């Protein structure tokens, strides 16, 4: 009898010393809370439920969206050409255009204009142009063929990669000696993409004002232009 009692006592002691089964513990925990997992070795409760904000997140975050934005490339090179009959002689228009030291008095946005050097058929000029927020000086080499051609090419400056203006004067209408055919062209490329975009918006208006300014200058120096019959007038414009 004593022996049986001792065996039962030892069995109870042994069963009390056995570690609890992890799987049994997890099963009991799952039974009470399916969304909670108990890790027996470290005593941590892990919640299986997703955080509220996790359900509203997209499955795939488009981190590359910014780099996929495509904007149309702006052509930085702008070109404009114009042909027209003007009621002034070739010599008169040549004198107006070649008198670059006077540009500051009548050319829109021209703040300063100086002749740096001069020799037969050529001169070197420096112009300062300004219209908010741009204020820039640049130097040009000017080719002169009296009374037919005035061609100016920018040789330096931080504003332009390329700038060239060409004025050509040829005989006008038969029977109207105080007329000439004007061929004007300008091509330029800004260094700055921002300036190129602005030029795209205002380019046509700026060029028209420039050409009109030279006509007004001729009117101031030589009086009213020759009256040309409407049916004989010519005015062609091309730009890119």
UniProtKB/Swiss-Prot annotation:
Keyword Transit peptide: yes
Predominant location category: mitochondrion
Keyword Membrane in record: yes
Membrane topology: Peripheral membrane protein
GO CC aspect terms: mitochondrial inner membrane; mitochondrion
Compartments where located: Mitochondrion inner membrane
InterPro entries for this protein: COQ10-like (IPR044996), COQ10_START (IPR005031), START-like_dom_sf (IPR023393)
Disulfide bonds: none
GO BP annotation list: cellular respiration
Transit peptide: 1-20
Molecular function as annotated in GO: ubiquinone binding
Keywords: Membrane, Mitochondrion, Mitochondrion inner membrane, Transit peptide
Database matches in Pfam families: Polyketide_cyc
Assembly and binders: Interacts with coenzyme Q.
Family per similarity comment: Belongs to the COQ10 family.
Role description: Required for the function of coenzyme Q in the respiratory chain. May serve as a chaperone or may be involved in the transport of Q6 from its site of synthesis to the catalytic sites of the respiratory complexes.
Protein name: Coenzyme Q-binding protein COQ10 homolog B, mitochondrial
Organism of this sequence: Rattus norvegicus
Source taxonomy: Eukaryota, Metazoa, Chordata, Craniata, Vertebrata
Gene: Coq10b
